[in-house]
Amino acid sequence: MDLDMNGGNKRVFQRLGGGSNRPTTDSNQKVCFHWRAGRCNRYPCPYLHRELPGPGSGPVAASSNKRVADESGFAGPSHRRGPGFSGTANNWGRFGGNRTVTKTEKLCKFWVDGNCPYGDKCRYLHCWSKGDSFSLLTQLDGHQKVVTGIALPSGSDKLYTASKDETVRIWDCASGQCTGVLNLGGEVGCIISEGPWLLVGMPNLVKAWNIQNNADLSLNGPVGQVYSLVVGTDLLFAGTQDGSILVWRYNSTTSCFDPAASLLGHTLAVVSLYVGANRLYSGAMDNSIKVWSLDNLQCIQTLTEHTSVVMSLICWDQFLLSCSLDNTVKIWAATEGGNLEVTYTHKEEYGVLALCGVHDAEAKPVLLCSCNDNSLHLYDLPSFTERGKILAKQEIRSIQIGPGGIFFTGDGSGQVKVWKWSTESTPILS
């Protein structure tokens, strides 16, 4: 995996895999009535086994790549901000994205196990993805339980993956081989990187490793599992099982993390954190989102529109995006008074586990949206037009972006997959 932006060397992670075939035209074709009812047994069937595209959806305006704010972590500008787009609140879902997305294609469970007797005649999918604008490069096997985090430190030639199997695995970016396994003696709830620091959330503590000088620190204080970590300016935030958010301030003189505060307000575990626009956003199992000022660490607003666990949060241009097990992705925008309110709700058929904002090969903004039916959808923004999806053995819990059009997914079976945007990407309708 030579993660060189120029793509000079064709290494493991930059080797383009076999992409899906481009879809045929839908002109003069009809959707199979029996397929819609879930009982078509014809192969080949002369009719379409997918819905016809709706009204034409033009391309999203080229991304401005603006951040919500130019805040920097203690190691410099963060690389985890979502891309922006030139849009306003009324652009969301303009091309029919407000309808509930219904899954119409299923992964063949026998193919996954390597023993499908039907071969090419099988009615179910024998591939890990649908869409011709990205492709699978390679698969990293080794974890025995759900992958809870993926980190690619800036400037490093190593990829780090964490799991509930109590390990962090280290992968060589050039060969794709596992070069080391850290046995931590406890389930890993999350992992992030910031500059030279690798930060790992565990039961009752946060581990901090400096991969440049091998410094090894244990940050005590959390009660229960640490589910989420994020860095804002010189502060490290940890979302914990007891509903509190612990804060440490990085001391550049001593290269240590000094306890700074404990943010109270959530009544159940804090499972998602994000920093943007001089704010900390926290999502919890109590179904709420809290907005905290980074100036004084006070809660300035509580958002209660979700009806189940708030699983993931990202900032995109001037908007906050949140997802929940209530099957929705909500888009929040600030009112004239400064408070956030829902400006658009995108509905899924299943609970939504994780969000990640990326740019495709043409610099268009795309939302990666993982659901608990073992799928990940790719949506153009702000229209929410679907352009492809990724399928997995189990739920995709972790998504991480790398340079050069690379992105990673980790699922409940322990598999980590490496994907890459195609040089020429063409949106499709599934």
Swiss-Prot record:
Pfam families, per the entry: WD40, zf_CCCH_4
Keyword RNA-binding: no
Zn finger residue spans: C3H1-type: 26-52, 102-129
Keyword Ribosomal protein: no
Alphabetical UniProt keywords: DNA-binding, Metal-binding, Repeat, WD repeat, Zinc, Zinc-finger
Region (Disordered): 1-27, 56-90
Start-end of each WD repeat: 142-183, 221-258, 265-304, 306-342, 345-389, 391-429
UniProt superkingdom: Eukaryota
MF (Gene Ontology): DNA binding; zinc ion binding
Signal peptide span: none
SMART domains assigned to the protein according to its UniProt record, in alphabetical order: WD40, ZnF_C3H1
InterPro entries: G-protein_beta_WD-40_rep, WD40/YVTN_repeat-like_dom_sf, WD40_repeat_dom_sf, WD40_rpt, WDR86-like, Znf_CCCH, Znf_CCCH_sf
Name of protein: Zinc finger CCCH domain-containing protein 48
